[in-house]
Amino acid sequence: MKNNDKLDSHTPMMQQYLRLKAQHPEILLFYRMGDFYELFYSDAKRASQLLDISLTKRGASAGEPIPMAGVPYHSIENYLAKLVQLGESAAICEQIGDPATSKGPVERKVVRIVTPGTISDEALLQERQDNLLAAIWQDAKGFGYATLDISSGRFRVAEPADLETMAAELQRTNPAELLYPENFEPMSLIEHRHGLRRRPLWEFELDTAKQQLNLQFGTRDLIGFGVEQAHLALRAAGCLLQYVKDTQRTSLPHIRGLTMERQQDGIIMDAATRRNLELTQNLSGGSENTLAAILDCSVTPMGSRMLKRWLHMPIRDIRVLTDRQQAIGGLQDIAAELQTPLRQVGDLERILARLALRTARPRDLARMRHAFQQLPEIHRLLQPIDVPHVQNLLSQVGQFDELQDLLERAIVETPPVLVRDGGVIASGYNAELDEWRALADGATDYLDRLEIREREKLGLDTLKVGFNGVHGYYIQVSRGQSHLVPIHYVRRQTLKNAERYIIPELKEYEDKVLTSKGKALAIEKGLYEEIFDLLLPHLPELQLSANALAELDVLANLAERAETLNYSCPTLSDKPGIKIMGGRHPVVEQVLKEPFISNPLTLSPQRRMLIITGPNMGGKSTYMRQTALIVLLAHLGSYVPADQATIGPIDRIFTRVGAADDLASGRSTFMVEMTETANILHNATEQSLVLMDEIGRGTSTYDGLSLAWACAENLASRIKAMTLFATHYFELTTLPEKMEGVANVHLDALEHGETIAFMHSVQEGAASKSYGLAVAALAGVPRDVIKRARQKLKELESLSNNAAASTIDGSQMTLLNEEIPPAVEALEALDPDSLSPRQALEWIYRLKNMV
């Protein structure tokens, strides 16, 4: 539609539509017309593409045909779910006027705005996953970041100091919708995300943000939340809260405070580490064979979501971790028994959010009632458990006898989906409702009596009384007897073989019945809203209870997993180091068909770095990752897959494991590898756990070995981080002779003829040889290629043995007798087929400068 179209050139209905659309220019407007929601103009074209619905035309307005698309009102939720998954938003416009009394178009207004980050309807949400709305702010001092889960009221803020930390936060929280200011500079950080919303700068104004937040929480200042001076975070939080108020168009009583998340409270993991450890998402983007897939057998959706939050935010507070360990130990004997009533509790957290937003449906209230009915059994099971943390959680669970009684009296056993058609409020709850219902429900008896009376009085055996939606109540007589009806019978409808009549008595009763049905429905809707008013004052205790029930679910789940998977309770020490006896990889051991070979690990201030050698497929990466996962699980408070484990203080986990070309950002494998390595060397500390796998393999041997050597040296002598350093460069196995705190370990294999058996067991000392050719044969490389490779290997080995510089130290790292010129080295490493024309031109200039 052209901007200069005048409103008055359109029909009255289209004028109404265009006024409403002008208030929501950037989102799809679903405009209720009878039994359909219609979309017009550009909205119709977009919706037809996004939702795969027909694009038609509706007459003409202002002299032009109007593009139109529509969806039936009863299936709107399915279409909204699809839009939300695509990161789109929609405004829902309803008819609020009465068509019977309206002059001109029926009055309509937008009653809700559905956006990916503000949905609370269970049909639109993924049950076992948090759905977050986030806002981001950035200036010279760093970033401000706020997240809100509207389906629980959980409001968090943080102030990431730099781009890498901000990227890690975005990956950890994975918001469904992200608000950002119009002058946001590092767009590369967010541009690949769904659900981006550009907001004007004034929405991030600091004083307005403080005012909005104090108003929401009913406080004079934000000191009690520890965020008064967090100006960057508050700007983001203010914009986020305003956006939620604008879209929800209702009060938000379940959002009662906000929490500042500080990096030092948890173990810091960057985006690469989270990806490499496959916590909740595997490297292919799925959820199979992840740590969560093995660990999450929670019986409530809210417990499952909490466990995933724990996985992504391991904590360092020994007191909290010890509480969790003791609770898991205390629950092991009753875990299965406790999970039975917990399973019946369901998703109380999200039901309470819908209650707060006054969008809870009748079945939500029935589920809440069912949850309350489980609490006595949960109390019975947990009261004998003599663990302080369990008893503390039990006191938070509480009992809600009065609310349970209210819902048992007020709501029918199996309520309908919507309150719209009535039948939700139970008989006996309200005397006036029962009277009006009796009138409406008494219609059947009355009609039966009327039919018998009239048939006998008039002697017409074909006479019967009925009802249809168009003509209401009627008396029907066959065509053959219609001449016998009395004069006060007024003809209402003629059929092929019968006539239908109305009499004053029946008309009077019809009016009374229809009035009583309407009256009963109005009373019922009023009572339903009244139940909300009776429940809402208890919202804080109910939210506390839901949170405690979710944590009990997580702890019972971890207790069951520990028992089933043979995990042990780790010791959390304040002395630096990691000592693991019989450690296993929690995911690989479940996927493997043969028994998993467990392995020990010792890291300490005197043994800070392990140089790990051994064949490809020998288990180096598995050994490294299992160490990180055991450390991470220990900082959940969980038991760990090991015979015994003692874990000292850890501040960060870094992984440089495997890489693929980051084509979207135009970065090669080697560039990705070096970027991640630089991040580690800049940010690791003495208390960090660092996994380095095959550093330098993305470039030439000469460069690669130099880089690997320098990185290992730096980590061991300057940073002194606890490091697992897997490598194929056997020259690195001489490092322990030159530096203190470095040791060699290797994974063994046995070669028999042309076959190879991987032992998967970690031994002290360096590997005696590489098994690259045996692995190549195993992978199906043709035998003649393997044979030629063996010949070449012998030639190279003899050349290497004759070389003058056969040993390496930090000052001289010559691999061959003569140094290869850099230009030749670069050319050898170059793959011409992978270069774009522009990259090829750049390389010509680069090589020219090298010569």
UniProtKB/Swiss-Prot annotation:
This protein is involved in the repair of mismatches in DNA. It is possible that it carries out the mismatch recognition step. This protein has a weak ATPase activity. ATP binds at residues 614-621. Belongs to the DNA mismatch repair MutS family. GO terms for biological process: mismatch repair. InterPro entries: DNA_mismatch_repair_MutS, DNA_mismatch_repair_MutS-lik_N, DNA_mismatch_repair_MutS/MSH, DNA_mismatch_repair_MutS_C, DNA_mismatch_repair_MutS_clamp, DNA_mismatch_repair_MutS_core, DNA_mismatch_repair_MutS_N, DNA_mismatch_repair_MutS_sf. Transmembrane segments: none annotated. One of its GO terms (cellular component) is cytosol. Keywords: ATP-binding, DNA damage, DNA repair, DNA-binding, Nucleotide-binding. One of its GO terms (molecular function) is ATP binding. This is DNA mismatch repair protein MutS.
